[in-house]
Amino acid sequence: MAELYYDNQADLNRLKNKPIAIIGFGSQGHAHARNLADSGLDVRVGLYPGSKSWAKVEAAGLKVMTVAEAAREAQIVMILTPDIGQADLYREHIAPAMEPGKTLMFAHGFNIRFGQIIPPQGIDVSMVAPKAPGHRVREVFVQGGGVPALIAVEQDATGGAFEDALAYAKGLGCTRAGVLRTTFAEETETDLFGEQVVLCGGVSALVKAAFETLVEAGYQPEVAYFECMHELKLIVDLFYQGGLNYMRYSVSDTAEWGDYTAGPKIITDQTRAAMRQILADIQSGAFAEDWIDENHNGRPRFNAYRQADINHPIEQIGRELRRMMPFVNPREVKPGEGGA
């Protein structure tokens, strides 16, 4: 059974005299810094000199300094920058300040799990990973609630790594909802698997393949877009609220019957075998090695994949149709822009 922890099991006083450095001020960094500060903790934000976020930190009323300065001042250093780049950032600016007894924290285990960051033996290494985007972590906290989180300890040099991580989670508001204890390996491997097989890779490929099937059969691309992409949100929202059962309760009996009869034809034994191979590649480190090499080589395949999907007909049709629907709050990514 999962180990769950709540507010009454976490002691925020453990962190009252432990300065905290939040490295990065993106989605998660913004939420962590502001929530912890509002919880009465001593927070500073570490950024590169000249960072566009510098003024945002100052506007939020928080202390801001370089990454190296923040790491030197802090007892707890939470790295909240993108996975790729963390290792160099750590080696150049954080590692020199990681004296025995300090704590290095993460919100995702990629660089620890795959050996890109190897902390010294004398420090604690832990993880607090809220299961929501940063804006929601902040929004729910301000409303008096919290989002669930995962918590893990990779290295416990002081004997109090878990208790400090739990206190940190309380500072974020996460123990109001409940935090689940895991390991760096479990969090990293399941996170990558979910992204690749369902949330990003699986859903994107399914939507495109279904759209292409309808268009090739002579149906209007606009109708195919509505059926294969636009309406997906309606179903995902039902999943989010009440799981598969609530979705089936909410749709028509015809849709539910099609769910039962057609679904197994899409997810076949071959599909499940592919899922197992994807998981094996994650567990072995093959995926991480490929992704790290891709970045070292300038991302040629990554950029080609991205451009191909930008040019896919479903994207062209989608841009046109979303202009008809201002209520969906249409967002378009400019050329050259990308996520973390």
From Swiss-Prot:
Gene3D superfamilies: 6.10.240.10, NAD(P)-binding Rossmann-like Domain. InterPro entries: 6-PGluconate_DH-like_C_sf (IPR008927), KARI (IPR013023), KARI_C (IPR000506), KARI_N (IPR013116), KARI_prok (IPR014359), NAD(P)-bd_dom_sf (IPR036291). Binds 2 magnesium ions per subunit. Mg(2+) 1 binds at D191, E195. One of its GO terms (molecular function) is NADP binding. Pfam families: KARI_C, KARI_N. Its cofactor is Mg(2+). Its EC number is 1.1.1.86. Keywords: Amino-acid biosynthesis, Branched-chain amino acid biosynthesis, Magnesium, Metal-binding, NADP, Oxidoreductase. GO terms for cellular component: cytosol. NADP(+) binds at F25, G26, S27, Q28, S51, S53, D83, I84, G85, Q86, G134. Mg(2+) 2 binds at D191, E227, E231. The keyword ATP-binding does not apply. One of its GO terms (biological process) is L-valine biosynthetic process. Pathway: Amino-acid biosynthesis; L-isoleucine biosynthesis; L-isoleucine from 2-oxobutanoate: step 2/4; Amino-acid biosynthesis; L-valine biosynthesis; L-valine from pyruvate: step 2/4. PANTHER family: KETOL-ACID REDUCTOISOMERASE, MITOCHONDRIAL (PTHR21371:SF1). This is Ketol-acid reductoisomerase (NADP(+)). It comes from Chloroflexus aurantiacus (strain ATCC 29366 / DSM 635 / J-10-fl). The lineage of its organism: Bacteria, Bacillati, Chloroflexota, Chloroflexia, Chloroflexales. The gene is ilvC.
